[in-house]
Every structure is written in structure tokens, then in C-alpha cells.
Curated annotation (Swiss-Prot):
GO terms for cellular component: chloroplast thylakoid membrane; proton-transporting ATP synthase complex; proton-transporting two-sector ATPase complex, proton-transporting domain. F-type ATPases have 2 components, F(1) - the catalytic core - and F(0) - the membrane proton channel. F(1) has five subunits: alpha(3), beta(3), gamma(1), delta(1), epsilon(1). F(0) has four main subunits: a(1), b(1), b'(1) and c(10-14). The alpha and beta chains form an alternating ring which encloses part of the gamma chain. F(1) is attached to F(0) by a central stalk formed by the gamma and epsilon chains, while a peripheral stalk is formed by the delta, b and b' chains. This is ATP synthase subunit c, chloroplastic. It comes from Porphyra purpurea. Gene3D superfamilies: F1F0 ATP synthase subunit C. In plastids the F-type ATPase is also known as CF(1)CF(0). F(1)F(0) ATP synthase produces ATP from ADP in the presence of a proton or sodium gradient. F-type ATPases consist of two structural domains, F(1) containing the extramembraneous catalytic core and F(0) containing the membrane proton channel, linked together by a central stalk and a peripheral stalk. During catalysis, ATP synthesis in the catalytic domain of F(1) is coupled via a rotary mechanism of the central stalk subunits to proton translocation. It is found in: Plastid, Chloroplast thylakoid membrane. Pfam families: ATP-synt_C (PF00137).
Length: 82
């Protein structure tokens, strides 16, 4: 039973990191593309767009970090493994 729980924890940790990276990765690419497009249209507001982009990228990246925290807790602080 213990080996099944350990194997499931490793698989779940891999899925947590993988799935947590897909959404923010797509969102970051879309946000960067739209920011570059906005800067190309209105170069005079480049500083404001860049600041907003960096803030939104930080928020998106935090979702990936949460997935990493879940994966690490499954691997190293799993209460189901004896």
C-alpha cells in the first residue's frame, strides 16, 4: 500500500507542475503579444504598458509557483506516506 501511495504522489506531483505551467504559459504569451502590439500602436504609452505587463506577468507566474508548492508538498510532506 505504501508503494502505491508513493507512486501516486510522484505522478500527482508531475501533473501538478505540468498543468500549473500550461495556463500561465499561454496567458503570458498572449499578454506579451498584446503588450507589444499596444506599444507598436502607441509608442508614447510604452512605460505604462510595460509596467502593467510586468505586474500581470508576476501574478500569472504566481500560479505556477503554487503548483510547484503543491508538487513539493506531495513529494516531501505527504501525510499519507508512513
Amino acid at each position: 500500500m505504501d508503494s502505491i501511495v508513493s507512486a501516486a504522489s510522484v505522478i500527482a506531483a508531475g501533473l501538478a507542475v505540468g498543468l500549473a505551467a500550461i495556463g500561465p504559459g499561454i496567458g503570458q504569451g498572449s499578454a506579451a503579444a498584446n503588450a507589444v502590439e499596444g506599444i507598436a500602436r502607441q509608442p508614447e504609452v510604452e512605460g505604462k504598458i510595460r509596467g502593467t505587463l510586468l505586474l500581470s506577468l508576476a501574478f500569472m507566474e504566481s500560479l505556477t509557483i503554487y503548483g510547484l508548492v503543491v508538487a513539493l508538498s506531495l513529494l516531501f510532506a505527504n501525510p499519507y506516506v508512513g
